[in-house]
């Protein structure tokens, strides 16, 4: 066995396990907690049962409050029963406590509530046990005593029978309510949260091992099977060349998916500023919430794409949201693997995250990815519209039901998850762009001839419900005049991958870039400007409230575009933003 190739051993083991599982048809998973859950999938049960920093969970704290309410409410009813007879409070206390008899006094009902309170608080709040046995004993003892009390109490000698009956029934119901709440709410929700949290904080081997032993039917769509890393290979081997080819193909697939999302028409406006910059959002099944920022930048499209893609290691110099940014593997001139560390956000609630991304960039012409020869020809000849364009593949819309995308033969196929788009009819080209910039009807192509407003107005306003009524009534200073954009779009994309050379750091939480990308659209007659569209969908891992995550992501996007404009101004001053020459 020691002389066998590790890849052969692994393949044999996977085949044996898959065949064994296929014979066990009765095996069904209720849910797969090992999959990379999005922040959007965190349930209320998890939030209620989660014990942050070792503190008491919300659901257990409510149980302790319920037990306290039991004692206080029973005591209040007892006071009403003894005072309503007309006796002085001290005389009533003397009869009920000092001269106590089980036949005439109701103080024993309060005593049972006190004992129940002390026992439950001691075991479930102080000792923090997670078993139903104690609550079962306390409830059983309380109910047995109350039932016995009904038979031995002297009801004929009582003056306020109604209140005394209410006192006993209330104590009985509260005791059973505590037992039900602990057994059906506290214990299940805390166990669910612990299981969920262990899954999210498991080591790197967990998501690499478990998906490998699941057959296709047991594996949920977009599971971590798409994101576990490859086995190490010897340097300068033939397998490295094959791996580079797979990374290249994976980058092209991710480019197409990012372009599909950018071109989709089901975006909802979230924020709009006075320069016309907009932030949209949309919801995708199995992915979560995706954001898109649209802005106009006074810089050539290709030059801006090259600066952001090829000079990524310089990004921390002008983007304060990044602590570190570097290329860890160069695959080819338009594909690489990068490592980035972001600063915290959300008022300190979102800590620093690090990301390992597979990036790719290409030129799209009429919705198709162009090869190197076509890219060079299109870049050198703007006016030739009769080119015989042999592009690598067209971008097709993927419906919600298209979930059986074949995986690459290697485990690096992390971007093979399907990004479903809306099933509605396809919008006219650039209609989304026009709507985001407030134009009434841009038709198949749009124009922008005016200069952008001053760069000191980055205040965003909530769009939400009123955006539909205001989209067609935006004033002239906020909407550039109509013009044409070229059919050429420079697109970059990024998706998270597992890369053995960059293991998770204990200093940061490893985030997941589900999908992100930029589209740089050229403008006819304005070669020194372009339209930038940025889509972003992240899984930051860990527990982050939804409203905090939304605020942090939208704020980071607006800060990024503001810093990008400042960076572009510096580039123009240095002479690096000259418009490309045309023939």
Curated annotation (Swiss-Prot):
It is found in: Membrane. Residues 85-104, 154-161 are extracellular. GO terms for biological process: cholesterol transport; steroid biosynthetic process; vesicle tethering to endoplasmic reticulum. It is a multi-pass membrane protein. Residues 1-63, 128-130, 183-583 are cytoplasmic. Residues 263-573 form the START domain. Its main location: membrane. GO terms for cellular component: endoplasmic reticulum-endosome membrane contact site; late endosome membrane. One of its GO terms (molecular function) is cholesterol binding. InterPro entries: MENTAL (IPR019498), StAR-like (IPR000799), STARD3 (IPR051869), START-like_dom_sf (IPR023393), START_lipid-bd_dom (IPR002913). The keyword Heme does not apply. Residues 56-227 form the MENTAL domain. Keywords: Lipid transport, Lipid-binding, Membrane, Steroidogenesis, Transmembrane, Transmembrane helix, Transport. May bind to and transport cholesterol and may play a role in ecdysteroid biosynthesis. This is Steroidogenic acute regulatory protein-like. The gene is Start1.
